[in-house]
Amino acid sequence: MDKSELVQKAKLSEQAERYDDMAASMKAVTELGAELSNEERNLLSVAYKNVVGARRSSWRVISSIEQKTEGNDKRQQMAREYREKVETELQDICKDVLDLLDRFLVPNATPPESKVFYLKMKGDYYRYLSEVASGDSKQETVANSQQAYQEAFEISKSEMQPTHPIRLGLALNFSVFYYEILNSPDKACSLAKSAFDEAIAELDTLNEESYKDSTLIMQLLRDNLTLWTSETQGEEADNVEGDN
């Protein structure tokens, strides 16, 4: 199958909501070695976000059930074994994506926005790994995630408008990383607030093409800020991860 056929198959898979097939097609496109177009980049991102998202959601549900079965050894063992199965799937998906990023996507990225997009993706998938890791493995995945986010953040600050949806999406996910993974609410709030304020100050630079994406992410930043501020003030609330 040539590149255009693989891309067509990925689009078909997306319409059928068969995201594993979509990811397989876009992985094959990436392994051809050429730099991806914006459309191809987005197809790859959507495919893997759905594939890993389903496992993250399952993992959370099963972990919660596992905790509730304390005192019932047989049920707890069944829940634990099932959680470990989902965990292995999740880890394999993340390692697949990180391998594509390290071998093809980051080295081949020429425009700054592509570099930021892929480094953000690298931060995201190490973050997903860290959610299910423990001990030394957790420390390593957390450090790798932070390093990728930080590198992307520095490029985005110097090369992109504050209203650019990729820069805003990075700020959103990096702030979630500080809040959820590093347990640093002050740093999370500070990062989210700066990104929001800087974008508001330059709203006139928004082009029609990205207006919808940018304003949606700004809304998510504001929602998280409201939530995190109320939580740090001692109010009970569930964290809606506005994860881009």
Curated annotation (Swiss-Prot):
It holds the Pfam family 14-3-3. The record marks R56, R127 as: Interaction with phosphoserine on interacting protein. CDD domains: 14-3-3_beta_zeta. The modification N-acetylmethionine is found at M1. InterPro entries: 14-3-3, 14-3-3_CS, 14-3-3_dom_sf, 14-3-3_domain. It is found in: Cytoplasm. GO terms for cellular component: cytoplasm. Keywords: Acetylation, Cytoplasm. SUPFAM superfamilies: 14-3-3 protein (SSF48445). One of its GO terms (biological process) is signal transduction. Disulfide bonds: none annotated. Coiled coil: none annotated. PROSITE patterns: 1433_1, 1433_2. It comes from the Eukaryota. Belongs to the 14-3-3 family. Homodimer, and heterodimer with other family members. Adapter protein implicated in the regulation of a large spectrum of both general and specialized signaling pathways. Binds to a large number of partners, usually by recognition of a phosphoserine or phosphothreonine motif. Binding generally results in the modulation of the activity of the binding partner. This is 14-3-3 protein beta/alpha-B.
